[in-house]
UniProtKB/Swiss-Prot annotation:
Annotated source species: Brucella canis (strain ATCC 23365 / NCTC 10854 / RM-666)
Keyword Signal: no
The entry's keywords: Hydrolase
One Pfam family linked to the record: Lactamase_B_3
Signal peptide region: none
The UniProt record lists the keyword Transferase: no
Gene3D superfamilies from the UniProt entry: Ribonuclease Z/Hydroxyacylglutathione hydrolase-like
Family, similarity comment: Belongs to the UPF0173 family.
The name this protein goes by in its record: UPF0173 metal-dependent hydrolase BCAN_B0597
Superkingdom of origin organism: Bacteria
CDD domains: metallo-hydrolase-like_MBL-fold
GO molecular function annotations of the record: hydrolase activity
Family matches, as InterPro entries: Metallo-B-lactamas, RibonucZ/Hydroxyglut_hydro, UPF0173, UPF0173_UPF0282_UlaG_hydrolase
Length: 237
């Protein structure tokens, strides 16, 4: 399995049977400078969304139309995407598991919000925010936390799914900050590797992963992959 951070909370996940984009905010993403957008979306089969904010839904509609990708999202967000012309949708909700070729995806809790502005400038709620747990046939289990704070039921997520790789928001202000994110990883999970995200993009959130790296320093069993956007990491089952 190969995982590429595309800046902010966007990732490309490649396995033998699927190419999945998670929260594909590319155009307008300050953290995606230098990213080859065509390369990032090449061969995409699925798009998975954690929640309905513009910096996570991003380019979903355009990518889904161009590539015929199936979009996986909470039911309310999926309905809205259908109204925007997305044809291949697989809706779910918190606690639900969806099966696709080569992987399953489970919607788990996240502490955040989920809404988009309408043309009239009114905020439209788009279901609950989620984290997403991916179980693959031939690759380690992956947990993208979405946008969230720490919460004690992370212990249940670990008990149920035993994720080996974590994608963790660390930028503060709209999610937990680096020190709290490190606490979440150490207290509730046994990750082999973690990829921090939701930082080094907008100026009002943290610009570096320094606080997270410092918080993880006394937990050497977990490898912190705080590399520049565009870096490709490979993982074996």
């Amino acid at each position: 399995m190969k995982i590429t951070w595309l800046g902010h909370a966007a990732f490309r996940v490649e396995t033998a049977k699927a190419v999945i984009l998670i929260d594909p905010f590319l155009n307008g993403n300050p953290g995606a400078k230098g990213i080859d957008f065509k390369g990032a979306t090449r061969g995409v089969t699925h798009i998975a969304l954690t929640h309905g904010h513009g910096d996570h839904v991003g380019d979903t509609v355009a990518i889904a139309r161009e590539h015929g990708a199936t979009v996986i999202a909470n039911a309310d967000l999926a309905s809205w995407l259908g109204s925007q012309g997305v044809e291949k949708l697989d809706p779910g909700n918190t606690g639900g598991t969806l099966a696709h070729e080569g992987f399953t995806i489970t919607f788990v809790n996240a502490l955040h919000s989920s809404a988009m502005l309408t043309e009239n400038g009114v905020s439209q709620a788009l279901g609950n925010p989620n984290g997403l747990v991916f179980h693959f046939e031939d690759s380690p289990t992956l947990y993208h936390m979405g946008d969230t704070d720490i919460f004690s039921d992370m212990a249940l997520i670990n008990e149920l799914h035993q994720p080996e790789i974590g994608i963790v928001p660390i930028g503060d202000r709209f999610t937990m900050g680096g020190a709290v994110a490190a606490l979440a990883c150490q207290r509730y999970f046994n990750f082999n590797s973690v990829l921090p995200c939701h930082y080094a993009s907008f100026p009002i959130i943290d610009r570096t992963a320094d606080k997270f790296i410092a918080g993880m320093a006394d937990h050497p069993a977990t490898k912190v992959l705080a590399d520049p956007a565009g870096t490709v990491h490979s993982f074996q089952a």
